[in-house]
């Protein structure tokens, strides 16, 4: 069926604004972002946010900024109406957050909105807006400032509504946004009420250090390196995490340029280069950095939500960063040397006639809790059942081919079975065994979960802890029982066998970090992604040789769940 050509026409303003909203307003957090930026641009130093239903039910932002006169409100609802610029050239000397004049009309076109505002000494007015158009305006006294209430977000664009995530995920996105706002804006007081409960409160008198401790935790501040360096018009201020606080992704990095939260691969790369000799490969440092640059050096007009930036004079910026970071790290050089040069001295006894060294975990005992069957796990893909062979001869725990350890060559092991000699790649094997340990019920449910005599604790940010709280049931289905002991920490009550404690803690933190940032990602995908990114030692000394038996009980797989080579049979051709 072919469509007949139609005449070219101008779109009406509501349709134009709804299209624009598709670029600017991704979810409820996008609405909160635009409204609080309007408050900041209006000179507010107290901002109060309330949300219901993750923001889709209601968003209210109240401030004590300059406010508007009644006749300004209809103008503010027009596309490209702004008080920030008059000409295009003004963008390059901009000190405000917004400048396009698109946000307010875009939000109004996909919600029901109410604006209550007054200038100093003014009478005040309240305007009701539906589908982007004012339907009622009446006098309403109030103190100087503006309150914007947004109800029924996406009510008239059901297709957009169907693509939204859960209210819990929306709350996580709003929390991360507000945490960045708290870090970027000193001298501003913040209050966030979510579902009628106070989630965040920051007094405007609280300084930068207090705010970093609130968001990232006091332990981060205590161990981090503080930097504050200025060269002419350039300044860098913030905290660099200690070498012990590295992560598997860049999600622990918070960057602000001229008080705007942005992403910059250039800045991240420069910081990573400074840490290269102090943290393992494929790991990323944590930092909170605020750069203050001349406005004409920064182009924020790259992304609709202004989360990306182009920079001029990268050489000067790089020099400032390198000097500031080097000075900070050198001030703590003794402790760094101790961290970097510490070599494990524990010897692991090996018997060449077989694997007789058990996996010793003195802090853990067997518990009656059994790992759930796979049918109880809606979170994991059924396709992943191919990880464990379904051939009863190879997958049985009672009838399994014997494997004999021969020698260690650092990154690989040489082992022998009835088929011949195999090269086992340590890192890939460790990763695969960690992953399969999460699915230990695949081994005919013979492997009981393990309970810690003294529960180990794991710490993270409040945002990450909130995500983990929502996934406790899914983690229990994997044999991992957690209990929340503070707003930013959990106790690990039990775990699958054959997972080392430190690796488990690292993975839990990585899962929380990844989940808090990618709020729409499925749980099974998060599990797979985070295990892939986890750095397992390439050193055979760190490999528990008793796990070779388990590897062979899994049918001695050649490849890990992600396709990486685990073992290879040594053939005669290898010596020709």
From Swiss-Prot:
Instruction: Keywords in alphabetical order, please.
Output: DNA damage, DNA repair
Q: Which GO terms describe its molecular function?
A: ATP binding; ATP hydrolysis activity; ATP-dependent DNA damage sensor activity; mismatched DNA binding
Superkingdom to which the source organism belongs: Bacteria
The record, for CDD domains, names:
HATPase_MutL-MLH-PMS-like, MutL_Trans
InterPro entries to which the protein is assigned, alphabetical: DNA_mismatch_repair_CS, DNA_mismatch_repair_MutL, DNA_mismatch_S5_2-like, HATPase_C_sf, MutL/Mlh/PMS, MutL/Mlh/Pms-like, MutL_C, MutL_C_dimsub
Q: Which Gene3D superfamilies match?
A: 3.30.230.10, Histidine kinase-like ATPase, C-terminal domain, MutL, C-terminal domain, dimerisation subdomain, MutL, C-terminal domain, regulatory subdomain
Its Gene Ontology cellular component terms are: mismatch repair complex
- Keyword Transmembrane assigned to the entry: answer is no
Q: Which Pfam families match?
A: DNA_mis_repair (PF01119), HATPase_c_3 (PF13589), MutL_C (PF08676)
- GO process annotations (BP): mismatch repair
Q: Does the keyword DNA repair apply?
A: yes
NCBIfam families membership: mutl, PRK00095.2-5
Q: State the protein's purpose.
A: This protein is involved in the repair of mismatches in DNA. It is required for dam-dependent methyl-directed DNA mismatch repair. May act as a 'molecular matchmaker', a protein that promotes the formation of a stable complex between two or more DNA-binding proteins in an ATP-dependent manner without itself being part of a final effector complex.
* HAMAP family hit by this protein: DNA_mis_repair (MF_00149)
PANTHER family xref list = DNA MISMATCH REPAIR PROTEIN MLH, PMS, MUTL, DNA MISMATCH REPAIR PROTEIN MLH1
What family, per the record? Belongs to the DNA mismatch repair MutL/HexB family.
- Report the protein name in the record: DNA mismatch repair protein MutL
């Amino acid at each position: 069926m072919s469509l007949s050509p139609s005449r070219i026409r101008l779109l009406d303003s509501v349709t134009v604004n709804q299209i624009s909203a598709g670029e600017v307003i991704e979810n409820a957090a996008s609405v909160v972002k635009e409204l609080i930026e309007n408050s900041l641009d209006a000179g507010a130093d107290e901002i109060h946010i309330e949300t219901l239903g993750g923001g889709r039910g209601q968003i209210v932002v109240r401030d004590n900024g300059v406010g508007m006169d009644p006749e300004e409100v209809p103008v503010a609802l027009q596309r490209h109406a702004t008080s920030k610029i008059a000409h295009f050239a003004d963008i390059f000397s901009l000190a405000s957050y917004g400048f396009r004049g698109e946000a307010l009309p875009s939000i109004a076109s996909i919600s029901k909105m109410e604006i209550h505002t007054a200038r100093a000494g003014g009478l005040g007015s309240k305007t009701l807006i539906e589908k982007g158009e004012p339907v009622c305006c009446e006098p309403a006294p109030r103190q100087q400032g503006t309150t914007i209430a947004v109800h029924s977000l996406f009510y008239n664009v059901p297709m957009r509504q169907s693509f939204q995530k859960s209210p819990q995920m929306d709350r996580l996105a709003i929390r991360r946004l507000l945490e960045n706002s708290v870090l970027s804006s000193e001298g501003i007081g913040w209050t966030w009420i979510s579902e009628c409960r106070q989630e965040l409160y920051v007094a405007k008198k609280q300084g930068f250090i207090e705010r970093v401790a609130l968001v990232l935790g006091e332990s981060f501040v205590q161990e981090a390196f503080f930097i504050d360096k200025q060269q002419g018009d350039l300044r860098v201020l913030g905290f660099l995490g200690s070498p012990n606080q590295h992560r598997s992704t860049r999600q622990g990095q918070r960057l602000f340029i001229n008080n705007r939260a942005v992403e910059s691969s250039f800045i991240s790369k420069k910081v990573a280069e400074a840490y290269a000799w102090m943290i393992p490969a494929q790991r990323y440092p944590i930092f909170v950095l605020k750069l203050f640059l001349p406005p004409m050096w920064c182009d924020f007009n790259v992304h609709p939500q202004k989360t990306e930036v182009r920079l001029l004079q990268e050489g000067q910026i790089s020099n400032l960063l390198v000097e500031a970071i080097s000075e900070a790290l050198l001030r703590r050089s003794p402790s760094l040397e101790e961290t970097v040069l510490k070599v494990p001295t524990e010897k692991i006894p090996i018997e060449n006639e077989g694997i007789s060294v058990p996996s010793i975990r003195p802090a853990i005992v067997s518990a009656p809790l059994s790992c759930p069957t796979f049918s109880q796990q809606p979170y994991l893909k059924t396709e992943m059942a191919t990880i464990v062979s379904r051939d009863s001869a190879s997958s049985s725990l009672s009838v399994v081919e014997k494997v004999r350890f021969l020698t260690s060559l650092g990154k690989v092991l040489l082992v022998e079975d009835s088929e011949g000699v195999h090269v086992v790649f340590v890192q890939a094997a460790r990763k695969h065994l960690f992953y399969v340990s999460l699915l230990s019920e695949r081994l005919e449910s013979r492997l009981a979960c393990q309970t810690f005599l003294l529960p180990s604790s794991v710490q993270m940010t409040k945002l990450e802890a909130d995500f983990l709280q929502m996934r406790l049931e899914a983690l229990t289905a994997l044999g991992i029982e957690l209990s929340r002991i503070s707003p930013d920490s959990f106790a690990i009550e039990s775990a699958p066998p054959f997972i080392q404690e430190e690796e488990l803690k690292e993975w839990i933190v990585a899962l929380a970090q990844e989940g808090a940032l990618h709020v729409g990602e499925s749980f099974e995908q998060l599990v797979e992604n985070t295990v892939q990114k986890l750095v397992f030692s390439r050193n055979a000394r760190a490999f528990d040789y008793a796990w070779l038996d388990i590897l062979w009980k899994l049918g001695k797989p050649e490849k890990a769940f992600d396709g990486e080579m685990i073992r290879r049979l040594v053939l005669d051709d290898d010596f020709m």
